[in-house]
Amino acid sequence: VIIMNQIILHEMSKSFGKKNVIKAQNACFSPGQIYGIVGQNGCGKTVLFKCMSGLMPTTSGRIEIQLDDPAQKARPYCGVVIDGAGFNDSLSGLSNLVALADITKKADKKAIASLMTSVGLSPDNRKKVRYYSLGMRQRLAIAQAIMEDPAILLLDEPLNGLDYEGVKTVYDILKVQKE
């Protein structure tokens, strides 16, 4: 799922050695829309998200990120959820997010605590992440992706491990973020 200003793929390709994972893709993702990227397991969806977010370079072609609001350029333009988000298991969920926010100084502890409530983790925000279920880790990853109000959200399988309430919560959050 993608929520953004605009991302344009220009003949974007990604290879690992001789294996072409993504071949010369062109696409334009418009502002205020939610897109779903679907395909078989192993077809390169996660690789595409990593390239679009800047976590992985393309092999050829380019990815253009257009942000209309100059203020957006001053904050992290992209919030990302990639499968297997890395959190410090010895810290609580809240402490993980506060530590990440301390790096950029874009979110304060009060706002993060409110966000933990929004994603349904407030009863467990002081529990160490090592004791979080898969669904709780996914909620934490979503909170981390949106905590600095990014212009673009790239969410790779954001509903993995979520129960019905978690799915509903994520959909509600995406509706708000879209606007």
Please name every model-derived segment.
Residues 4-31, 59:
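A short, flexible loop at the N-terminus of ABC-type nucleotide-binding domains that lies
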Residues 38-40:
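The feature captures the beta-strand-to-loop junction immediately N-terminal to the Walker
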Residues 142:
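Hydrophobic anchor residue at the start of the ABC signature
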Residues 153-157:
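Catalytic Walker B motif of ABC-type/P-loop ATPase nucleotide-binding domains
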Residues 53:
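Helix-to-loop junction immediately C-terminal to a conserved catalytic motif
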Residues 98, 109-124:
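Conserved ABC ATPase "signature" region
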Residues 61-74:
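Conserved ABC transporter NBD signature motif
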